[in-house]
Swiss-Prot record:
Inhibited by DEPC. Completely inhibited by ZnSO(4), strongly inhibited by CuSO(4), partially inhibited by MnCl(2). Unaffected by MgCl(2) or CaCl(2). This is Agmatine coumaroyltransferase-1. It comes from Hordeum vulgare. Its EC number is 2.3.1.64. It comes from the Eukaryota. GO terms for molecular function: agmatine N4-coumaroyltransferase activity. The lineage of its organism: Eukaryota, Viridiplantae, Streptophyta, Embryophyta, Tracheophyta. Optimum pH is 7.5. Half maximum activity is seen at pH 6.9 and 8.1. The keyword Zinc does not apply. InterPro entries: CAT-like_dom_sf, Plant_Fungal_Acyltransferase. Monomer. Involved in the synthesis of hordatines (antifungal hydroxycinnamoylagmatine derivatives). Specific for agmatine as the acyl acceptor, inactive towards tyramine and putrescine. Has activity with the acyl donors 4-coumaroyl-CoA, cinnamoyl-CoA, caffeoyl-CoA, feruloyl-CoA, and to a lesser extent sinapoyl-CoA. The gene is ACT-1. The keyword Translocase does not apply.
Length: 439
């Protein structure tokens, strides 16, 4: 598969096409404490659409219209008047790259999570000032692949997914839904007086001197991180949920069961000592958990992490039901009170006084003995329709971070789940042998 780039340009908000006056380019949106707690890195995803797909000029025009409603993605990171990190709404534009492939898309489907897919989207390193970079690649058969690269500190997966859908709505002339909510200053105020009722040191924050303790694998083929895509059918998930919910007052959720199962399988594959502590960090969306609720169209980050913890021996020798109970208890703990405690702590002055930094560190390339879970099961990726139909395939880009688990709904649309599992190559065969076992 040879990808040839033909053009690259900045697309700016097209106010005239929407009958609106240009926005004020002096507008500054300070990052919230929840934005600052998230990963300061670029994330890439890939969509595939069958032919016919709208011409690139139509997609570009739709992008310009969508950016009128989502000016963040046409802006740049900078600082506000007080020196804090902020989004500058300067309408500098999002990057739009046009490319072609020399093969039919069917000949390379399903795309595999290898370095080859990196050619299907721009790199964040290509335009470090731009917050969103898009590549549209036409294949010889007329099919279209759209690759997005976005700065995670601007928004979480749910709000970024809302923008992807908004772009498709603007392209086909439909109203943007949900309506974006931009006023970050109206949310996440600290309480008076502050009430920090949970420990946030060592959870969302860590000492600055530990920020650069990056763990990397050693050289050699056995220490190469490989990403394996695992498909869990609807039938397998039903059996797993029945297995994990035996004797419970109500069935366990798909997310909790799949995470519990993979946590155990990855721990077995790693061959951890029985007394070693292992945890799983699960991203928890606070929109519906906070009171008052944060609107669905909110455009920033509303994520904190549940961190169930146990020993490797306890995890693998006890049934999956035990892991589900650990996960359920910790996820339930990340409630309105926890979010507000975090906000109060982040505004207490302790972060600055103690020189704390976010534990969400994109420089960590090896997470063992722990894992981290990004669940995209409820993000509306498959609602994106430029006018030629919804995508028939979606995937995260190649991201070889050992232990970073990404879950998403299968493109089959039948309730099955795809999991992208990065492990050292030396551990992968053991993982493959146990990941479909319910023992």
């Amino acid at each position: 598969m040879k990808i040839t780039v033909h053009s690259s340009k900045a697309v700016k908000p097209e106010y005239g096409a929407c009958g609106l006056a240009p926005g004020c380019t002096a507008d500054v949106v300070p990052l919230t404490v929840l934005d600052k707690a998230n990963f300061d890195t670029y994330i890439s995803v890939i969509y595939a659409f069958h032919a016919p797909a709208p011409p690139n000029a139509v997609l570009e025009a739709g992008l310009g219209r969508a950016l009128v409603d989502y000016r963040e993605w046409a802006g740049r990171l900078g600082v506000d008047a007080s020196g804090g990190r902020a989004i500058l709404l300067n309408d500098a534009g999002a990057r739009f790259v046009e490319a072609t492939a020399d093969v039919a898309l069917d000949s390379v489907m399903p795309l595999k999570p290898t370095s080859e897919v990196l050619s299907l989207h721009p790199s964040g390193d290509d335009g470090p000032e731009e917050l969103m970079l898009i590549q549209v690649t036409r294949f010889a058969c007329g099919s279209l692949v759209v690759g997005f690269t976005t700065q995670h500190i601007v928004s979480d997966g749910r709000s970024t997914g809302n923008f992807f859908v908004a772009w498709s709505q603007a392209t086909r002339g439909a109203a943007i839904d949900p309506v974006p909510v931009h006023d970050r200053a109206s949310f996440f105020h600290p309480r008076e007086p502050l009430h920090v009722e949970y420990e946030h040191r060592g959870v969302e924050f860590k000492p600055c001197e530990k920020a650069h303790d990056v763990v990397c694998g050693a050289d050699g083929d056995e220490d190469e991180v490989v990403v394996n895509k695992v498909h869990f059918s609807r039938e397998f998930i039903s059996k797993l949920k029945a297995h994990a919910s035996a004797g419970a007052p109500r069935p366990c959720s798909t997310l909790q069961c799949v995470v519990a199962h993979l946590w155990r399988s990855m721990t077995m594959a790693r061959g951890l000592d029985g007394g070693e502590t292992t945890s799983v960090a699960i991203a928890v969306d606070g929109r519906a958990r906070m009171s008052p609720q944060v609107p669905d169209g909110y455009t920033g980050n509303v994520i904190l992490w549940a961190r169930p913890t146990t020993t490797a021996g306890e995890l693998v020798t006890r049934p999956v039901k035990h892991a589900v109970e650990l996960i359920s208890r910790e996820v339930a703990r990340i409630n309105d009170g926890y979010f507000k405690s975090f906000i109060d702590f982040a505004n207490s002055g302790a972060v600055e006084k103690e020189r704390l930094v976010a534990t969400a560190d994109a420089a960590d390339m090896v997470l063992s003995p722990n894992i981290e879970v990004d669940s995209w099961l409820r993000i509306p990726f498959y609602d994106m329709d430029f006018g030629g139909g919804r995508p028939f395939f979606f995937m995260p880009s190649y991201l070889p971070v050992e232990g970073l688990l990404i879950l998403l709904p299968s493109f089959l649309g039948d309730g099955s789940v795809d999991a992208y599992v990065p492990l050292f190559s030396r551990d992968m065969n053991t993982f493959k042998n146990c990941c479909y076992s319910l023992d």
